[in-house]
Amino acid sequence: GWSSRSQSPTVASDSKNTTSTAAEASVGDYISISGLGMITLEGVGLVMGLDGTGGDPRPSPFRMSLLKDMQRRGVPDPKALLRSPKTALVIVRAYLPPLIRKGDPFDVEVRLPPGSEATSLNGGWLMETDLAERAVVPGEGVLAGHIFARAKGHVLISHGEGDSEDLAGVLRRGRVPGGGLSRKDRDLVVALKNRYRSVRMARRIADRIGKRFYAYNRHGVREPLANPKTDRTIVLKIHPKYRDNFPRFLRVIRQIKVREDDVTRQVRMQQLSGQLESVQTARKAALSLEAIGTKAIPFLKTALEHSELEVRFHAATALAYLDDNSGAATLAEAARHQRAFRVYALAALSTLEDAPSQLLLRELLKPLEVCNTEGCQHHGNPIEVSCPHCREAGLVKQSAELQYGAFRALWTRDRLDPVIRGERIGDLFTLHEIEAGGRPLIHLTQLQRPEIVLFGNDQELRTPLAVQAGNHIWINAQPGAPTVTISRYQVGRPPRREVVSTRIADVIRGSVKLGASYPDIVQMLVQAQRQQNVPGQIAIDAVPRTGRLYFREANSTTSPADAPPNLFPTSVQDAKSDASSEDEPDQAGAGQDDDAVSATGAGGASLVDRRLAKPDPADTSSTDPQASSQDSSGSRFSFLEKLFR
């Protein structure tokens, strides 16, 4: 039979108009993309090693499921183990992120089921637990699907302040950072819209994507990243350059032209170069040039001389993903001075492998010293060493978010970089000591991986000192003492002691030597900070965030929000203010008549003209296709949920 389905995005009676429209059509006009949502996984697990705070679980489907699993694993006398006050049955939940690969870690949350006799998960260890999709089927109860992942590890709970009644709920739940391991690869699936569905069109779209994005296998053979599977579906693999910013990868793919010869492409690049000069159209023009590939690099470079930071930023970002470092200095400038662009600038810098870009990221690890001398021509700007007024008074502008963001970008780029290379502590977590200057900072993580970063490699605990690391380890020091005594007391075992210096890194190592876990170390550091034994501040998951205000002088129409890079995980449920980890003021600065970047439902930032009394209906037609298909859930990709999340 024959099909009358149209093979171009527009049906028109005039064949010339139809041909023209088809030539202008982009891949995004033909496709929708699935596989962006989270897969919710659940399981029933057993937490061991509790200090008498566990309990025998009540009869329930959860208990039956756990007993079957323990019997399958050959655990001797599982019922006696469940009755022990050192164990507790827990519900394990995780969210499998898009594009995860087999063996990749992800966060897991655990909680006690309603009615559990257990009172606290503090100090516990989650035994290996299978995680699968689960669904309630009428008449059959809860059924489990394929096993997608397994989870295990130390349980980290929130160490909030309050009495035992206030903390009761907090102690009944926790998370295992990086405790899940995926057993499957997740790829994206590109689906042709029904009206364009055909084998020929699927091959054409896959061919256009594959010519722009490809990789080399271990034999050095070039392979396209898009492969047609049926007359409607194309399997899409992420390009390594976009591994930590796949939302941008999808936006670029949508800008690829389906039919375009060399002459037409050259004309279009000239047009896009002009659009790149305007703040209203710079973002989309940069994406379109990036979609063309390396031939567009000269046009993007010309925009680096533009007077507007916004234009320079969009051009520099596109250049970075084209593996050109010409805009690296602009990205570093945006990361330090413009919080609305910071997350995107750091993600782009992390993709550049050249030495100058590495040095720029290293500089971002350090606070910025600005002139605070009234009347000096450099007042409010970085100190000029040759200026006598600058030397009179300096003000250190320090951002925990920027320092840790630069660290994460460097770690993603090269985790063996000698400036940030860490030390593996007892196969429990990684300890990094960084010479950064400024006020001392300790950064702790509750997401992705257990990690402690000391900004200031000679940080020492103040004495007198008396804190705990877990239930059995005490850390004490007398006033003015140069050493700290770490003691472990446990019923039925002889006491153990370690004497170390007051350096925080040495205290951490000594505590782990006596059996402290990562949650125990976090507890110790938080307690020491509350008692003012820590010389600086402690920040937890201080990653760059989206949804911030950016002011500019020119009018603009509404521009769709960018979905955030997945380089920096955050939480959908995190209601904390950015100010908690951001010491420097918003450098956006302009008058009330300027345009602002406002938060959107997708968690991104949109450029909005604050002077408009009401939105222009015409603006809706200019919204990019990606705005409606970044995430069907309407939230930031949920791996950005903090599994207190």
Task: Identify the function of each model-found stretch.
Residues 7-10, 390, 626:
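Low-complexity, intrinsically disordered segments with a bias for serine/threonine
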Residues 282-292, 302-305, 312-324, 330-333, ...:
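Structural detector for internal amphipathic alpha-helices that build alpha-solenoid repeat scaffolds
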Residues 370, 386:
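The −1 position to Zn-ligating cysteines in a subset of zinc-ribbon hairpins
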Residues 7, 379-381, 392, 593, ...:
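Generic short amphipathic/hydrophobic targeting helices enriched at N-termini
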Residues 262-274, 294-305, 324-336, 354-366, ...:
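Amphipathic alpha-helical scaffolding segments comprising HEAT/armadillo-like alpha-solenoid repeats
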Residues 14-37, 42, 48-270, 276-281, ...:
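Beta-strand/loop-dominated core regions that host nucleotide or nucleotide-derived cofactor-binding catalytic loops
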Residues 1-16, 20:
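Bacterial Sec signal peptide processing site at the extreme N-terminus
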